[in-house]
């Protein structure tokens, strides 16, 4: 009967590498092979597809790995073994699985209450990333909206309206797409001055050298006077 001698291994070509870094613990890798065969991998967790573990020739093949733990994957391979038992391998580009969110720590809260409508907040983060906030007015700095590790980061908000800001957050998103948030202490922006109204004026003329003046105010606060002798 006819028989075939085949000593040529399948040739694999990368189509789409695994995104890196990524928080996707079941990543996919796309490749082509010039021969059909059985697929295997050096990654110990294996793959969920294709199932069964066979691939065809001359079309894009997708391998989706089983759940992978966090870490750097270096020098890992996929292999196609043809019917003659020749094995052709392809080394995957190094990739990182990262599911840990950045951790943010407060350094200096926003002063409250304050009439500063562009307040600043200081914090640190253990991971670099992109900064965002749920305060709708946003921030003017940093610009671009990136932060680094190892030093105090300052965020300065755009002009904020008067009011109480409660439960607001800042968020750092790392390169793998993990979000770490920090809730700001409640703060108040108040640019409205107290309104004073006279109740009883100082009697005049008078021989009283320590006169009294009676008034009302719409807000509590610290009292001063332009009279140099004070009160």
Annotated model-derived regions:
Residues 38-84, 130-175, 182, 222-231:
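Extracellular beta-sheet repeat scaffolds used for adhesion and glycan interaction
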Residues 87-92, 179-184:
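Extracellular and select intracellular beta-sandwich modules with Ser/Thr-enriched
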Residues 1-10, 93-102, 185-194:
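Flexible, low-complexity linkers/stalks enriched in Thr/Pro that connect modular domains
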């Amino acid at each position: 009967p006819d028989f075939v001698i085949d000593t040529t291994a399948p040739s694999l070509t990368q189509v789409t590498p695994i995104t890196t870094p990524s928080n996707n613990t079941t990543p996919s890798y796309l490749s082509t092979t010039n021969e059909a065969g059985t697929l295997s991998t050096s990654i110990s967790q294996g793959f969920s597809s294709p199932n069964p573990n066979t691939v065809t020739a001359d079309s894009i093949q997708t391998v989706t790995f089983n759940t992978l733990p966090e870490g750097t994957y270096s020098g890992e391979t996929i292999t196609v073994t043809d019917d003659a038992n020749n094995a052709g391998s392809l080394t995957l580009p190094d990739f990182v699985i990262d599911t840990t969110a950045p951790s943010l720590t407060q350094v200096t809260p926003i002063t409250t209450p304050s009439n500063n409508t562009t307040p600043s907040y200081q914090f640190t983060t253990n991971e670099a990333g992109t900064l965002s906030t749920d305060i709708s007015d946003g921030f003017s700095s940093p610009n671009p909206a990136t932060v680094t590790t190892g030093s105090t980061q300052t965020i300065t908000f755009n002009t904020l309206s008067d009011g109480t800001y409660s439960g607001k957050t800042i968020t750092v998103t790392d390169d793998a797409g993990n979000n770490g948030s920090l809730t700001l202490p409640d703060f108040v922006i108040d640019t409205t001055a107290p309104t004073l109204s006279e109740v009883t004026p100082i009697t005049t003329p008078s021989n009283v050298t320590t006169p009294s003046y009676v008034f009302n105010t719409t807000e509590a606060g610290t009292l001063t006077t332009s009279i140099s002798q004070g009160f």
